[in-house]
Amino acid sequence: MDQQENNGFGPIFKPRGKAVTFASVVIAIISGALLVFALWESEDKDGINFVFFATALLMLSVIIGELIRRVSMLAEEIRHKQTRYQGEWRRVFRSTFAFEYGSCILAVGTTSVLFVCYALLQNYEAFFRLDYGIFFILNCFVIPQLVFIVGIREPNTVEATMLNERNNKNVADGFAWNYYFGYLKLVLPRLEAQIAKSSEFRYKITKKKLYILVPKTCYVYDNIADADPRVTWAGDLTPCKINRGGIKERIYKQAVYRVAMTDKHEYFFILEYASNLMSLYDMSLHEDAPLSRQERDDQVVLFIRKLREILEGCKECRGKCEIVPISGDEKSKIADVLVAIHNATQVESDEADL
């Protein structure tokens, strides 16, 4: 792990990939192929035909059953037609019956209908039976409702987090976007100019970027020196004034901190905490905003990942900000982390010059 597991913060997990889909496809193909192969070896052609017929019938019943289950959801959404959908029936139906992979479902449903029709035409007497019809009706009208009522269909933790990560619905995603649009996008493009305006710090600051501390605990000290006495406030950059949210010339300023090491060498960093993380910390303690410690730990990792992704995608902000994950549990470590990052980037810069 880089820099001793991100300065004690721990591993930053990667986004979930397509392994679930791949595994499902492999299981379906292997199990289906083994079943057909076994029937083929026994020379049971009727059995093979039944496998294809049953698969198509089951798939069709699953699709129809899901549509019928959504009819019950429609009963609830109708009650909110005016408040949630501005009285538009089109929005009610789209919200209730829309599928993310609608074209794929339509193709599978059409193929299933064709298979069922073909099987009935080939062997009407074998497949047009009352028990098959009862089975089909149960799977369309009864089973989906029971599955929903008893909670079997409720997404598990993995499925819920996959959906949230894919659709930017995590608390951390909102925090990251808010931090970017409400602050970083405004100050980072102006950062070098503000450094140049500062007669006190323009030559002392060797790394012209904003360093943002992200503690795993989400606890943010009001004064960074309380976390590490070697990191002391040295002053502020020249503030920039921006008209924002109805406030004329709202002031945005960044603090400069001095890091004093035992070798009497001093470093100067534009440094601050990701202050909105304190809201995550407060949520984990507030009884009306249930957020477990594990969920909080996951959200702060997602915050780092999303914020890095956002900043990397913005040309005006790219390379002007360094997100520094720290454990937050141990004091007197911030100076060591900052100096290590400074020295590592200095080595990279020297190697690039060579």
Curated annotation (Swiss-Prot):
Keywords: Immunity, Innate immunity, Membrane, Transmembrane, Transmembrane helix. GO terms for cellular component: autophagosome; endoplasmic reticulum membrane. One of its GO terms (biological process) is autophagosome assembly. 3',3'-cGAMP binds at N178, Y183, R250, I251, K253, E272, S275, N276. It is found in: Membrane. Gene3D superfamilies: 1.20.5.5200, Stimulator of interferon genes protein (3.40.50.12100). InterPro entries: STING, STING_C_sf, STING_LBD, STING_TM. The chain crosses the membrane at residues 20-40, 48-68, 101-121, 132-152. It is a multi-pass membrane protein. GO terms for molecular function: 2',3'-cyclic GMP-AMP binding; 3',3'-cyclic GMP-AMP binding; cyclic-di-AMP binding; cyclic-di-GMP binding. Pfam families: STING_LBD, STING_TM. Belongs to the STING family. Facilitator of innate immune signaling that acts as a sensor of second messenger signals produced by cyclic GMP-AMP synthase-like receptors (cGLRs) and promotes the production of type I interferon. Innate immune response is triggered in response to nucleotides from viruses and bacteria delivered to the cytoplasm. Acts by binding cyclic dinucleotides: recognizes and binds cyclic 3'-3' linked cGAMP (3'-3'-cGAMP), cyclic di-AMP (3',3'-c-di-AMP) and cyclic di-GMP (3',3'-c-di-GMP) second messengers produced by cGLRs in response to nucleotides in the cytosol, such as double-stranded RNA (dsRNA). This is Stimulator of interferon genes protein 3. It comes from Stylophora pistillata.
